[in-house]
Amino acid sequence: MTWRHHVRLLFTVSLALQIINLGNSYQREKHNGGREEVTKVATQKHRQSPLNWTSSHFGEVTGSAEGWGPEEPLPYSRAFGEGASARPRCCRNGGTCVLGSFCVCPAHFTGRYCEHDQRRSECGALEHGAWTLRACHLCRCIFGALHCLPLQTPDRCDPKDFLASHAHGPSAGGAPSLLLLLPCALLHRLLRPDAPAHPRSLVPSVLQRERRPCGRPGLGHRL
């Protein structure tokens, strides 16, 4: 073999080695780039998932800025005027829902769900929570509406008669006064200058004094 063949062989081998080296470098760069891209995508998804969950659930909890009203009107107790709703919702008449439970009501509206218009009042000069007697019914003003109890005085509509019907009788207040009468009489007898030395002797005399008719002239004290 001549020297030309040796030179050609060396050139071919060196060219092949360079091609192999370039191919390996390209494969390494491609592999590293793919791993970095996968890592970036995973990091972005991990960062976005809590944000999306928080925003979506926050929207479900707080509701819209304009509020959302109940599907059915709230029933009210005619006796006490308290609303009873199986599915509480926010808010009526343009109220703003806060934290899913409270309503910020616009002007002239009040109530838990902004359902009462203060401009439409059945109470006249009565304030919220005040009681009144209306057509023999005891009524209470609740958010501008009168809520009345069942008829309590079918024969008489005087408020004094209504209060007297709930009393226990005329002798209910007399028992405490009778119980206090005997100690007061004993104390009065003890403070007298001519009281006897033994307190036991006071009891018959006090009892006799209490049995004596009061206010009749000509009767004196017997000690």
Swiss-Prot record:
Where does the record say this protein resides?
A: Cell membrane; Secreted
Function of the molecule: NODAL coreceptor involved in the correct establishment of the left-right axis. May play a role in mesoderm and/or neural patterning during gastrulation.
Q: Where does the record place the EGF-like domain? A: 86-115
InterPro entries xref list? Cryptic/Cripto_CFC-dom (IPR019011), EGF-like_dom (IPR000742)
Q: Which family does it belong to?
A: Belongs to the EGF-CFC (Cripto-1/FRL1/Cryptic) family.
Which keywords, in A-to-Z order, does the entry hold? Cell membrane, Developmental protein, Disease variant, Disulfide bond, EGF-like domain, Gastrulation, Glycoprotein, GPI-anchor, Heterotaxy, Lipoprotein, Membrane, Secreted, Signal
Report what the protein is called: Cryptic protein
A molecular function annotated in GO for this UniProt entry is: nodal binding
Task: Give the signal peptide as a residue range, or say none if absent.
Answer: 1-25
Which Cys-Cys disulfides exist here? 90-97, 91-103, 105-114
The entry's propeptide annotation covers 159-223
Q: How is it modified after translation?
A: N-glycosylated.
A cellular-component GO term for this protein: extracellular region
Q: Which gene encodes it?
A: CFC1
Instruction: Provide the disease association from the record.
Output: Heterotaxy, visceral, 2, autosomal: A form of visceral heterotaxy, a complex disorder due to disruption of the normal left-right asymmetry of the thoracoabdominal organs. Visceral heterotaxy or situs ambiguus results in randomization of the placement of visceral organs, including the heart, lungs, liver, spleen, and stomach. The organs are oriented randomly with respect to the left-right axis and with respect to one another. It can be associated with a variety of congenital defects including cardiac malformations.
